[in-house]
């Protein structure tokens, strides 16, 4: 009962935060964009029995007990995943985050991968220490089941050139690494400067 109540509190906290802070869902993608898709396989009957009505609106086949069992055994529930887990994006390209699953997910930038804000899932997935960014509810964007959110544009202040880590703050094993690449002329200039300095 403790687990059931605890999970339910967390889920409804997430829905409340989503209502306050989420961007508008259903945003159309544009040509040349980069999509990150989030998947799960929640069985609505068993997930809603534990988490409350509406927690899972999908037609997945993994029961709640099977989900917890797989996570406990392997520290990963494979059907709960980001795709791709790693990607390269050129400066100027927009990103979009699509939730193809039946549960709410987040796509949160973190300095280092860690746990989320659901202590039970942190523990059994082997991520006991939450990523600090996952405890800052005011900045977390919740992506509803079936929703699409506008992500940062590569090369912007939110996604500059370099390597960036993103994770779901509910299911912290759902992770993506984005490598933002400089335009060819910038990369060529940087290489030339490095070679020039190496000769001095």
Show the residue positions of the predicted features.
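Extracytoplasmic copper-binding redox domains, predominantly the cupredoxin/blue-copper superfamily
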Residues: 23-200
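N-terminal secretory signal peptides that target proteins for export/translocation
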Residues: 1-7
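Short hydrophobic transmembrane-like helices used for membrane targeting/insertion
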Residues: 9-11, 27
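Bacterial N-terminal signal peptides
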Residues: 12-22
């Amino acid at each position: 009962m403790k687990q059931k109540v605890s999970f339910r509190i967390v889920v409804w906290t997430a829905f409340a935060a989503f209502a306050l802070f989420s961007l508008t869902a259903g945003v159309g993608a544009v040509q040349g964009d980069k999509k990150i898709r989030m998947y799960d396989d929640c069985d609505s009957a068993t997930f809603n029995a534990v988490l409350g009505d509406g927690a899972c609106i999908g037609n997945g086949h993994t029961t709640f007990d099977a989900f917890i069992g797989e996570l406990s055994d392997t520290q990963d529930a494979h059907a709960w995943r980001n795709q791709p887990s790693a990607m390269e994006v050129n400066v100027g390209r927009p990103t979009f985050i699509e939730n193809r699953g039946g549960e709410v997910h987040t796509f949160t930038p973190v300095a280092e991968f860690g746990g989320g804000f659901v202590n039970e899932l942190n523990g059994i997935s082997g991520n006991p220490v939450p990523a600090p960014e996952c405890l800052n509810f005011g900045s977390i964007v919740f992506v509803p089941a079936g929703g699409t959110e506008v992500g940062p544009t590569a090369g912007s202040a939110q996604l500059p050139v370099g390597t960036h880590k993103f994770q779901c703050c509910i299911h912290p094993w759902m992770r993506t690494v984005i490598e933002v690449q400089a335009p060819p002329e910038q990369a060529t200039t940087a290489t030339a400067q490095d070679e020039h300095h190496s000769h001095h």
